[in-house]
Structures are given as C-alpha cells and as structure tokens.
Amino acid sequence: MIFLITELGNVEFDKNNFKRCKFKDIIFKDCIFNANVFSKCIFENVSFENCRFYKPDNINIFSDECIFMKIIFKNCNLENSVFKECRISDLKFIESTLEHAIFSNVLIENNQISDCDCRGLKIINSTIEKFRFEDKNITKLDEYVFIDTIKLDKKYKKSYEEVARVYKNISKKLEENNLINHASEYYYLSKCIEHKSLTGIDKINSTIYWLLCGYGERPTYALITSLEIIFGFAVLYMFTGLSISGNVVNYVEVFSYNFSERNVVTDFMSCLYFSTVTFTTVGYGDITPLNLSVFLSAIEMFLGLTMTGIWTATLARKITR
C-alpha cells in the first residue's frame, strides 16, 4: 500500500498493523499514533509535526526493515517508541521527546538531534554514521542513557573515524548535561577507536598517550607505567653497577667470575630500592651509581618527575570531576 496524501491533520491512528506500506511526501500534523506496528514500511520525505506516539502502556513499534529517508520529527512525543532492525537515513529529531525510546539493530546514517529530551534513550547493537547534535539550547540526557558498542566496518579506515566522531559528540553532550563520569567513558572510547585509524608517528604518539594515562581518563595506567619503569630500571642497575656500602653489585662481572657467591634476591631488592628512591627523586645517598648507572639514574629521575606529574594531574582531574 502506498500513501501519497500531501497532508494529514488531527487524525488518530489506533492499534493498526501497517505492513509493506510506503509513506511518501506527507506531512502529519497534530496526529496521534497509539499502539501501532509498522513492519517493512518505507517513509520517504515525511514530516511529523506536533504528533504524539505515546500513551501509557501503549507504544509504537517500527520493525522488520522499516526504512526512513529524509524524515523530520518536530515537537513530537516518541517516548518509549521502539525502532528495531530499521534503516534510518537523513532523519532529524527537533524539539521532540525520545525519552526511553529504544533503537535496536538499526543502521543510522547522517542523523541529527536538536533540543530533544533523550533521557533514558537506548541505542543497542547498531551501526551509526554521522550522528550529531545541533542545539540552540541543550538536548537532555541522563545517567540512564545507553549507547552500545557501535558496529564498524574494520576494512575501512573511514569507518573508525566516523565512529570515533560519534563517541566524541556523545561525550560532549553528556558533559553539557553535567554527566562527567559518563562523558569521560565515551571520550575514552572515542580515543581508542580513533587510535585504530591512525598510522605512523600519530599512532605512536597515541599509543604512548594511552600507556601513560589512558588518554587522561585512567589514573591507574600512570601508576602501572610508573611501577614498570621502576622494576625495569632495577633490573638494568643489576648489570650496570651500584655501590652499596662498599660492595659492588654488577652482574656482568659476576657472570664472568663467581655467580654462586651472590644473593640474587638481596641484590635485586637493593637495586629496586635504589630505583624507587631515584624515580621519586628522594635519593638518600646510601647507594651510589657506577659507570652507566649514573646516566640511567638521570633518565629515571626525569621519567619519575614526568610520571608523577601525569599521575597527579590525571587523578586530580578524575576526583574533581
């Protein structure tokens, strides 16, 4: 069935089952849609103005490969509406209510949300491309909003870039709604996805940024990296030489002469102690670096100052937010 009426106003659609219908070049004004099911329907160049798709305990369902092309929902109530297995392209939600609406297994292409109420919105197991917010005021989001891991085509670099941009847009909008913890998680996801699209020096820089502090969102990463540096330098000091109370620890020489007389655990703990005080720039002076260890200790002190600053800044940022 094809609907080619140019305009419908003040019409109530109650508990209908629309199957394989095509709605084209139609303007719905002040209409009420109550408990309707749209299956395998096509909506093309259709505008809904001041329409209501919600009554308590009666929701509208769009499912089974419904297609939306060049659609506008303006000042509509789509609360609790369900969009399942649909293709949604060039669709605009303007000053509408999408509270607790569910989008499941949908393909979303080049869609826009402007000044809408999206509290409790769920997007599950879907592919999203070019999804953006264009607000004069602020689209409302809350802690119950859930955007599932977005599907992407791993064969195309552009797919990673688009998904990263979507996550960044969501993060920015959550931050505007003072949902800082949620915003930081979506920002972290955006950076992880963006990392996969990078090459060369940009990818190296991104990897370092991730290892150091999880793109500024993971203070524990800075702590773990610091511990790895301390342990790594402790091992190096065992082979480059330290003077401990007149005794020299240098396992390059030990391997050449008499290994059996050395207490490896005690020597390693001494090197670990020296590495720790060097990294934290405390330095009690009871252990003296020898030969190459002097140069290594200078490097470790610089890394210690840097990592302490990164860890402190990242932790403070998370706490204050």
Sequence positions of predicted segments:
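Alpha-helical transmembrane segments of integral membrane proteins, especially early/N-terminal helices
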Residues: 147-154, 185-191, 265-266
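Short amphipathic alpha-helical coupling elements at transmembrane boundaries
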Residues: 185-188, 210, 297
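Pore domain of cation channels
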Residues: 259-321
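Tandem repeat scaffolds
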Residues: 1-168, 173-174, 179-182
